[in-house]
Amino acid sequence: MKLKYFGTDGVRGIANETLTPELAFQLGRAGGYVLTKHAKDDEQPRVLVSRDTRISGQLLKHALISGLLSVGIEVMDMGIVTTPGVAYLVRKQEADAGVMITASHNPVQDNGIKFFGSDGYKLSDELEAEIEVLLDADKDNLPRPSSTGLGSVTDYPEGGLNYTAFLEQTIPDDLEGLHIAIDAANGATSSYVSQIFADLNTEFDTMATNPDGLNINAGVGSTHPEGLAKFVVEKGADMGVAFDGDGDRCIAVDELGNIVDGDKIMYICGKFLSERGRLKDDTVVTTVMSNLGLYKALEANDMHSVKTQVGDRYVVEEMLKDGYNLGGEQSGHIVFLDHNTTGDGMLTAIQLMYVVKQTGKKLSELAADVTTYPQKLVNVRVQDKKLALENQAIKDIIEKVENEMNGEGRVLVRPSGTEDLLRIMAEAPTKEAVGQYVDRIVAVVQSEVGVD
């Protein structure tokens, strides 16, 4: 289902250019109406609203809230809380919906609006389509109460504190004895990390915890973990964790300064849970972009995997369908469904630290089971991406390469979700091998269906 406004993670755009306050107002009206129309008749619906630290968040928040109020919704303004914090608090407060204003790991000029249902899950494609119909309607026929039916705003600053208290009780013991380094990306976790990791009795050092509205994700956080890697070594920490702007991702760094990505975090936590009989069906849910090294490590330890398309919402859908409790993405969106309904960076960090403490092993030792295979990705512009995948010559070269790999590599050819591109990716034991495999497939794609 191709939507006009909603992408894989809400509505995104350049703040005040494509994501305007006018659009935020309309999203408040349309989204608020769709998500609360089934609220009990005897009470006004309630919606939680939060944002990350980017400067445009204030502009968009006020516009969005105005839209919500105009259709008679009571708004609880939480200030700055993480995306997974909103997902948790919607359920705790028994609210009708939650809205997070963020562009996650994107640069400061971008922003977005992300909705959660009363169950704490991101919206289905069908609900998003219903909102879009109202956004594009010739006439706005939604309710416009003029007095008694209008909504009002209540500040809910304790929301963030309730969320951090929840995080701290997701492990049965504290983390005393661990020395950790934390990169908060100058984002939504900045004002919470010191309190949480002090309460858990860690020794900790922090970086990128001083947001100024403009420095969110700027060379720091989960998409730029190199700075944290140096910081860990410099401080002599046992490990480091980096979050992104809205706190739904976590990338770790071991005591030697090596990056421990989402694949390795899933493996480490999955193995720990599996050994204790707490990993449902001994299965981890991943996306097609997870590295072959993860699958080999899972297999070697009698664990299974299920693959979905790219996007943490699809991981969650698969987990719900079959009752799995651990899944995620290489990028650091890790979902612990026993605790929260979406990827949660601080929750992931706490679970990973707990494994390190309980096993008594260094993070580098725990991550060593996963050998990351060299990967190469090339985008090729084509006339028709759907027809390209049905081309016999392309099918033949993919099959030939896969046969040559003989289980020691993999090929993934998939269409771009937004452009007429084929994404050609391969993994193999050496850089030379993976380069040669990809180049051969690219040559056939270009000669058969490529566009100069």
From Swiss-Prot:
- What Pfam families does the record tag this protein with? PGM_PMM_I, PGM_PMM_II, PGM_PMM_III, PGM_PMM_IV
Q: What Enzyme Commission number does this protein have?
A: 5.4.2.10
So where does Mg(2+) get bound?
104, 244, 246, 248
Q: Which GO BP terms sit in this record?
A: carbohydrate metabolic process; peptidoglycan biosynthetic process; UDP-N-acetylglucosamine biosynthetic process
Q: Which residues carry this modification: Phosphoserine?
A: 104
GO CC, sorted alphabetically, is: cytosol
Q: How is the cofactor bound?
A: Binds 1 Mg(2+) ion per subunit.
Active site residues according to the UniProt entry:
104
Q: InterPro entries from the xrefs?
A: A-D-PHexomutase_a/b/a-I (IPR005844), A-D-PHexomutase_a/b/a-I/II/III (IPR016055), A-D-PHexomutase_a/b/a-II (IPR005845), A-D-PHexomutase_a/b/a-III (IPR005846), A-D-PHexomutase_C (IPR005843), A-D-PHexomutase_C_sf (IPR036900), A-D-PHexomutase_CS (IPR016066), Alpha-D-phosphohexomutase_SF (IPR005841)
Keywords, alphabetical: Isomerase, Magnesium, Metal-binding, Phosphoprotein
Q: Which reaction does it catalyse?
A: alpha-D-glucosamine 1-phosphate = D-glucosamine 6-phosphate
Name the coenzymes or cofactors required. Mg(2+)
Would you identify the family this protein belongs to, as annotated? Belongs to the phosphohexose mutase family.
User: What does the function comment of this entry state?
Assistant: Catalyzes the conversion of glucosamine-6-phosphate to glucosamine-1-phosphate.
Q: Could you identify this protein by its name? A: Phosphoglucosamine mutase
Q: Which gene encodes it?
A: glmM
